[in-house]
Amino acid sequence: MLNSWPLAKDLQVLVEIVHSGSFSAAAATLGQTPAFVTKRIQILENTLATTLLNRSARGVALTESGQRCYEHALEILTQYQRLVDDVTQIKTRPEGMIRIGCSFGFGRSHIAPAITELMRNYPELQVHFELFDRQIDLVQDNIDLDIRINDEIPDYYIAHLLTKNKRILCAAPEYLQKYPQPQSLQELSRHDCLVTKERDMTHGIWELGNGQEKKSVKVSGHLSSNSGEIVLQWALEGKGIMLRSEWDVLPFLESGKLVQVLPEYAQSANIWAVYREPLYRSMKLRVCVEFLAAWCQQRLGKPDEGYQVM
């Protein structure tokens, strides 16, 4: 049992150091001196009885304990800000511009309707919604919040899981009547595969797991596109086998217009909100992330706890 609890201001100092990359830059952000920042980190490390940061000529790096502390600090500070927002006598409302990015298919089918509902709840917000067919850089593309269907998030961003998702192999019954259904990943090379080049997907390489191992298989076919919506239409027309997100194909699987191929295999493709600044700093960012998380989980359902994609 600790003799005292870490102070919120010390957790904030740690977060600022991680995001700015140095003690001096964190001090400037906080409006304090480097000596103040150093002292608060020393107090935090003494309180927790562990080393949180390693300093060298190349910069500052989190220790294993520091990484865990940083992750908890983000959550604690966000909860603390939520407490202040909820109980303060002067109710504040999120306002101003927020720029949101997403891929075309998921953006049109899910995020655009979500933004419509978001604006009903928070009319003081201004939203610029931009769709991309490539992986974006939040700074260069001037995006505050990016919705990504991809588990590989760079360390210099913060990511909040909106909901679980996986990509699965599907084909129309018409196609599977013409060609024997593959019994292994290797047999995919003998099939017409509908290849998609969207944002995070490597063209012609499908990485699939069965809960025990992950394999990469090279695929090809007569048709390919950078539009998942076009590839889905081709699959429905019986043109080949595709790899698509579960949220995109579930209605067609239920209606029998598509059949799952090699159902023991899938590709992890969870849906994330990706941003640069901690949520406790920005009410409008926090409101958007929390709203989109609730929206996605309500409409896409809870994840299948019994399935694990390697």
From Swiss-Prot:
Keywords attached to this entry: Activator, DNA-binding, Transcription, Transcription regulation
Pfam families (alphabetical): HTH_1 (PF00126), LysR_substrate (PF03466)
A single BP term in Gene Ontology: positive regulation of DNA-templated transcription
Domain HTH lysR-type residues, every copy: 6-63
MF-aspect GO terms: DNA-binding transcription activator activity; DNA-binding transcription factor activity; sequence-specific DNA binding
DNA-binding region extent: 23-42
UniProt xrefs under SUPFAM superfamilies: Periplasmic binding protein-like II, Winged helix' DNA-binding domain
Highest taxon, organism lineage: Bacteria
PROSITE patterns (alphabetical): HTH_LYSR (PS50931)
UniProt cross-references to InterPro entries, sorted A to Z: LysR_subst-bd, Tscrpt_reg_HTH_LysR, WH-like_DNA-bd_sf, WH_DNA-bd_sf
Bridged cysteine pairs (disulfide): none
Family: Belongs to the LysR transcriptional regulatory family.
Summary of the function given for this chain in its UniProt record: Positive regulator required for L-tartrate-dependent anaerobic growth on glycerol. Induces expression of the ttdA-ttdB-ygjE operon.
UniProt-recorded name of the protein: HTH-type transcriptional activator TtdR
